[in-house]
């Protein structure tokens, strides 16, 4: 989320003067063209109060035309302060911020989201969630998040990639990758239990490379911990086909994409925990790596059927395995996959955001 808002600020600064109010530490990470103010409280309640007061003070002095909330959580601040000074209020909603199962949030936050002059959503699925939350259709705009595109989709130096394989004991076989936090929504445990055995039966020397760590301080984290996934893998007789890399650097992630044969994205259908978009599928596509995913939430906006991957009906584990096997045996064209990702370049997304805000998007 922080990286997304960083890019939004950077892109909008090409079309307008931009000032950002962010959490503690954000000033050191700000784009050069963007002024940053901070709300330094670390606890949620004090942070929101401090952010509201600072936003109001800045808005009275600076008189912006638009006040934009980077998520539903800060929507009340944007909407209320905008009304105080006569500015337009804009909210960028991501999915989960429209479905949170919390009485106060649904009673206070969602009505204020619906009162924004414009609500930008990250996918077609999130648009439907916004409509159910009471947002008028004429106030909705879909702008998918952008992705940092590599200079080309070539995998990288072959010697470096071979060394990376050896270092992490990835073997010579086909590599499936999963990139993201080990949350219940991402469905890695279910994939290892229900899908991977079918793939291994047909492609016995393949390896699932899992990038990402388990979230801390989350009630459901244990259900998708490394230990629980390993236990399921042993029960399914696929423990030898899994490697955990944990949290890695951007350079190491580029290596992972460089050696990957397929990206798997087995997101689960969870009504109060939707997948708003599926940025990792675009990041994989930018490197010429196809994705197999369940057709849930905003994922269909991030995977082009038979161009950048395959979409499978939720819960169809045998269909998921069959699609993965087919793409491992007969890969899609890497250049066509990468061409799909070009639609999500930050340059294009910046223009779409500017147009959604009513700014002049002409260079």
Name each model-derived stretch:
Residues 241, 247, 258-273, 289:
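Acidic donor-binding loop of glycosyltransferase active sites
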Residues 159, 170-186, 192, 196-197, ...:
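Conserved donor-binding/catalytic core segment of Leloir-type glycosyltransferases
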Residues 1-27, 32:
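N-terminal subdomain of nucleotide-sugar transferases
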Residues 281-286, 290-293, 303:
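Short hydrophobic beta-strand element within catalytic cores of glycosyltransferases
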Residues 212, 222-252:
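Nucleotide-activated donor-binding/catalytic signature segment of Leloir-type glycosyltransferases, i.e.
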Residues 69-75:
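Short His-centered aromatic/hydrophobic patch
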Residues 125, 146:
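Carbohydrate-associated surface elements
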Residues 305-306, 310-317, 325-331:
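Conserved acidic donor-binding segment of nucleotide-sugar-dependent glycosyltransferases
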């Amino acid at each position: 989320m922080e990286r997304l808002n960083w890019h939004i600020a950077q892109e909008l600064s090409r079309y307008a003067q931009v000032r950002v109010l962010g959490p503690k530490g954000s000033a050191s990470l700000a784009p050069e063209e963007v002024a940053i103010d901070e709300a330094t409280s670390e606890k949620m309640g004090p942070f929101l109060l401090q952010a509201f007061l600072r936003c109001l003070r800045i808005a009275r002095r600076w008189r912006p035309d638009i006040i934009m909330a980077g998520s539903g959580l800060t929507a009340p601040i944007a909407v209320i302060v905008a009304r105080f000074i006569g500015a337009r209020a804009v909210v960028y909603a991501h999915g989960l911020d429209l479905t949170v199962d919390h009485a106060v949030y649904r009673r206070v936050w969602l009505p204020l989201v619906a009162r924004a002059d414009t609500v930008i959503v990250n996918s077609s699925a999130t648009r439907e969630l916004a409509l159910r939350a009471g947002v008028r259709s004429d106030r909705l705009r879909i702008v998918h998040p952008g992705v940092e595109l590599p200079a080309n989709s070539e995998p990288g130096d072959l010697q470096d990639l071979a060394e990376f394989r050896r270092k992490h004991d990835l073997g010579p076989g086909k590599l499936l990758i999963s990139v993201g936090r080990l949350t219940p929504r991402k469905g890695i445990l279910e994939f290892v239990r229900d899908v991977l055995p079918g793939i291994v039966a047909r492609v016995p020397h393949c390896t699932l490379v899992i990038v990402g760590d388990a979230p801390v301080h989350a009630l459901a984290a244990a259900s998708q911990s490394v230990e629980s996934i390993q236990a399921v893998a042993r029960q399914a007789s696929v423990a030898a086909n899994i490697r955990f890399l944990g949290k890695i650097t951007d350079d190491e992630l580029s290596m992972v994409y460089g050696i990957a044969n397929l990206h798997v994205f087995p997101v689960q259908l969870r009504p109060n925990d939707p997948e708003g978009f599926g940025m990792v599928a675009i990041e994989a596509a930018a490197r010429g790596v196809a994705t197999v995913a369940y057709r849930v939430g905003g994922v269909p906006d991030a995977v082009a059927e038979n161009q950048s991957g395959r979409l499978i009906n939720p819960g169809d584990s045998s269909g998921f395995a069959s699609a993965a096997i087919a793409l491992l045996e007969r890969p899609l064209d890497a250049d066509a996959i990468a061409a799909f990702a070009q639609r999500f370049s930050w340059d294009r997304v910046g223009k779409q955001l500017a147009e959604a805000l009513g700014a002049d998007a002409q260079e």
